[in-house]
Every structure is written in structure tokens, then in C-alpha cells.
């Protein structure tokens, strides 16, 4: 992983609603995995295990969580640019959050557990796609990916550039064209 790569972040969520200027989980909402954000890598800073030395050299990042405490030799900080060019077609913020949409949903309602995800074709080897790290073809059952119980991230190198590019462009087009709703709450004293 290095400069020019793109992180897509996923997590476990439950829908919330704003009630009297406080967010509360909706009682009838289903929990689900979804892709929630992105970060384009502009720079990779190898912090290593000597965080004190790193903080002396890079004072700008001294308060970053990976610049304090005890870490192993692979400890790394990734930096995003202000913007990047997505396939030369759009200028996108270097990092951000995706809106909730069907395209970002990974959980399959009919799956036996939350570990089974519906994934795009570029991430499905039966459709010519790539296999994420910590997985192999045995993890694909009935068209779903049974995710590994380990790791908080998976790495993959899309082989179907055309399908991946199309999927990613559609995902970012949703972001570019989304309305920007605002809701105001009064400050309490």
C-alpha cells in the first residue's frame, strides 16, 4: 500500500435519527455493514516503533494516534491530498464520507450472519474480480463473500479495471451530485 492507492473504509452501523438535537438509534433499524468512506493516499510516512524519534522529525504530526504510544515496526501514517483526479474525469476531495445508499451496503438481508457480504463484481472471483487479503475462493458461498474474522482492513488489486472503474465512478458520482441538507439545532446553555 502506498502513494496512488485508494482506501475504501467499511464498518458496522445502525441507522440513527435526530431527536431534539440528539442522535438516537432507531429502534426498528437493522444493523449492517457498509462502505462509509474513502482516502486517497498521497504520502506514506513510516513511523516505525520509535514514535519519539518520529515526533521530533515530524512535529506537525506529533499528536497523531500513530505517533504516540507503543507500535510495531510497520507503524505507518497515510496522508491524503486536498483533492485527487479520479481517472482524469472528476476532481474529488482526498478523503471523505459516502452517503448511505444501496451501492455502499455490504450486508445481505438473507445471509446467515453479518459476516456474509454482497460485494460488487470487481470483488468477486466468480465474475472475474479480485480476492481480498485474508480470503480465498472458498470464502465465496452462494454469491456472497464470507468475510474473514480477522483484520480491520483487506487489500485487493482489482483485475477487472473496467468494472472497478465503472463501479467507483458511479459511487463518486452519487457523492458529487448529492444534495447538501442542513439541519440547525439551537445551542443549549
Model-derived features with residue positions:
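Short N-terminal edge-element motif at the start of the domain
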Residues: 1-32
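Contiguous surface segments at macromolecular interaction interfaces
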Residues: 31-36, 44-189
Amino acid at each position: 500500500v502506498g502513494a496512488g492507492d485508494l482506501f475504501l473504509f467499511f464498518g458496522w452501523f445502525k441507522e440513527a435519527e435526530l431527536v431534539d438535537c440528539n442522535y438516537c438509534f432507531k429502534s426498528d433499524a437493522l444493523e449492517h455493514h457498509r462502505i462509509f468512506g474513502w482516502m486517497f493516499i498521497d504520502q506514506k510516512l513510516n513511523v516505525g516503533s520509535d514514535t519519539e524519534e518520529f515526533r521530533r522529525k515530524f512535529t506537525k504530526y506529533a499528536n497523531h494516534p500513530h505517533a504516540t504510544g507503543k507500535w510495531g515496526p510497520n507503524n505507518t501514517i497515510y496522508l491524503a491530498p486536498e483533492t485527487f483526479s479520479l481517472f482524469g474525469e472528476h476532481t474529488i476531495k482526498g478523503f471523505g464520507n459516502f452517503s448511505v445508499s444501496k451501492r455502499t451496503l455490504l450486508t445481505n438481508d438473507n445471509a446467515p450472519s453479518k459476516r456474509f457480504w454482497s460485494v460488487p463484481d470487481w470483488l468477486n472471483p466468480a465474475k472475474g474480480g479480485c480476492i481480498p487479503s485474508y480470503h480465498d475462493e472458498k470464502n465465496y458461498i452462494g454469491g456472497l463473500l464470507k468475510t474473514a474474522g480477522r483484520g480491520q482492513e483487506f487489500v485487493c488489486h482489482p483485475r477487472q479495471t473496467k468494472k472497478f472503474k465503472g463501479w467507483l465512478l458511479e459511487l463518486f458520482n452519487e457523492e458529487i451530485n448529492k444534495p447538501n441538507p442542513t439541519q440547525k439545532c439551537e445551542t443549549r446553555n
